Each structure stands twice: as C-alpha cells, then as structure tokens.
C-alpha cells in the first residue's frame, strides 16, 4: 500500500506550540488518557500509567509514524477483545487529536497507529538547533548513578592484541554513552602486575638477556628481545618481571591513547595484595563460614552460592589466586569506593569465572545485580580473501598497533563497533581501505566532510545563515529532508536505548543511517544553487547545521572524529 500524501506542516519557527515534551511522551499521555476515558465510559477496571505505554515507529512507513500495542497488552485485564478495545481507543482519540496528529487508525489484531503532519519533525529540528551539540540527546536515564566500567585489563606481559582493542572500543564507547545519559562514570584498567605471569615474564626476559633457553611457557614475542636489550637490572625474576611489565604497560597506554581510550584509573593488583586487602577479604568470607582449608590451600564455598564448584582463594604455595584478588578488588569497588554499579568487560575466556565472582560479591554483602559482566567474543581479521596472521612481534596474537597503523584509529574504532560484543565476528580490513559507500568509515566521514563543504561554499558565496527565529522550517517538506529530520528526531531515543541495553553499536547503526540520509539529501536537494528559493536555502542551511550536530554527537560517542574535509 502506498503512502498517502502527507499534510502540510502547521509549524514554523519559533513554534507556537507550548507543549515542548517529545512527541513520544505526548502520545503516551494521550493514549493513557484515552484508556481512562474508555474505562469510565464502558465500566472497565483499567488504569494505565503513561510511562508504561509502549510506542514504536512502524517498520513500514505506510503504517503511520507511531504505533502502540496498548490494547493488546491490556485487553485481558479489561476483560474485552483487543481489537474491540483498540476500536474504542481510536474513537476517543479522534475526538481530541493530540498536536500534529492528523489521523488515528486501527490496524491488525489491535494496533493503534498515528499519522502526523510534518510539524513534529520541524519541532525536533528546532530542538536540535536550540540545544546544540552539548545539550541535545542527553536523556537522563542514569539519574546520577555512579558507574565504574572496567575494561581491557590485559596482563602487561605483551603488546595489546586485537581482541582487547575491540572490547576496549566497546568499553570506552559504553562509558561515553553512560556519561551522556546521566551517569557518573569512571573508566578503569585493572593491572595484573603480580603473580605467576610476572615471574614468567621475568624468566623470559632474563633468558633473552643471558642467551639462555626460554623457560617452559615463556613469552616468545620479539618484544621480549627488545626489552632484554634494554635491561640492566638484577638477575632477580620478580624484579625483572616488574621492570618489563612497567615498560609494556607504558606501551599499552600509548596504543590505547592512539585510538582515544583514556582511563581514569589504572588499578594495580600488586597494590591490593601489598595493602592486605586480600587477607581482609578472605577473613570476611571466613567469618561467614564460607572458607575452609584443604590440601594446604584455602578454599571458598562458592558452590553453595550458585557456582558449579568451590574455588581456591590461596594456593598451597601461599600465592593468592586471581579470584581472591578479584574479590578484594570488587570489595574495594563497591564497599570502599562506593560505586552503585560496576560493569566488567572481559574476554570470553573469563566465562568460567563469572559465577564465582558473582558468588563472592554476594557473600560480601553486595546485591549481585549491581555487577554486570559483559563477555567479548572472539575477533578474527581477514584482508580480502586472506586471513590476517599473527605477528612475530606479539608472539601469539594479532597486534593492535599493526592494525591501527594499517587502517587508522577512526577505522579501527568504527570497525570494532560494527557488531555486538557477544557475537564472534570476522572483520575485513580491505573493506575500510576503499573510498566507496561499502566502506562504513569513509561513508560516514564523507557525510561530515560534505557538511563542512557546504559551510565553505556558503562562505565563498558570502551567504550567511539568518537567525533561526527568522527561518520558516516548514519549507522542509522534500522526502529526503524529512528522512534526515526523522533520523535526527530518533537520536535521544537511540542514545537512551544504547545506555539501557549496554549496546553502543546502536549508535553505530544510527550514525550510518544519518550519513546515508544526509547523502541522499545532499544529492537531491540543492542548497546554494542559483535557482533555489532563498528562504528554502536558509532552511536547508539550518538542516545541514543540525546534521552536523547530530553526526558530531554520534561520532563523539563512538570515539571517532568528524572531519570537515577529506
């Protein structure tokens, strides 16, 4: 079914509508009010809170601009048929149409669909321009919640690999989204700078420095040879390991900074053990009868708290296990530093540790629902038809630095945020080298460059944007213009959903959609051509500015630059 001709907009700028709530909120209140009216008129026991009214944009434009399933989810409570209830709701809504609604229609088994004039989109445009890059799309879903996001936390025993980089992009983008949505966010990297892996690193370093055979399980990468050439310290395994770990960590920091990942805190595992926090944490568990000794080791009764088996906290040789350190660390997060919520981003190889960590957190008196663990799945890279092989420098992994040097930091960020964290993914490096619409990085950044080009062309022609209050935004009626407006109107909802669902990839999808819509507008709607009405040209210039704002917000959340030229 083809879409009927859309009615002309009733709204210019500034708007005369005094209700500045988002259209979604207005429709929700209208629907809740209609439910109340139907309940009174028909004697139904039915009350609906506006916040529970589900509204969505239909997948097909011919079904209208907004749709609600309220009749289907409340019909049973009301003791009536969903379609009959929807029919009554349509009749009530038609008596007093909400602003911008031109028709309300019954569809399918009980959907209520709304068709709107274009004025709601012009209102959204005015909101983008009034609030700007700093103010638009800042839905307060966090209400000041203090959230710590721990991510990457790779052992400082070798160069950071692609998997860590990909999961790092997720953690950083999630932190950016949370910060924009009313959360107080702290980004943290947990440095595993003690224990067996540091001693193994020390033995590997000393073996290379002395020309001896590598120890079993030693680190084989060329970076160890480079470090050995610099080392002039004592022949002490722990001292050598700590020295090498410090140098490697400096390199990790530089690598991550090159893709815009900056941490608020680098938290040392060694500092936890040296402070006595591990012993204190074990003592707290012991006081609850959750610790026992067996075979010379100290065990945690985690099975009785939902784990598949009990876990060792301290080995027979006296070394604390990763779990013991993690529990002391999370005790510090929740009970010492007082975070309301902690989000840990781990690699999938940590899957077996989640239940024991949750059990330990609960045993320490923390509601385990306050701890969220996100597991990043395996990442594979191809280059055209060729699998990207592990490099000699990293030893047993694909080096993130190599990828950044090849495709650049922006491409690395966007590529790593193209698919969900919990899906094993294969990425083609060749796809982000092409200057074509198939290259998501080029396609998105070209939209930004075209926006910059419009500004340069306007300056060249000495065309200045008139004050917004003088602009008639209702002139923007071309389908391509409306596509851009719809996309901009969606951004606050997209950002909110990305925060609630912990899914920054939703922003990636939106950015690509805006870029596509802007390219269509740029191609079909001349802005500064001689035959364009000056009033329309001014409205289009403001639409370009709104697109710049939206793209800057979206790319900023992804940690990607918005170039003014390419």
Which residue ranges define each predicted feature?
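Non-catalytic interaction-recognition regions
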Residues: 2-122, 129-566
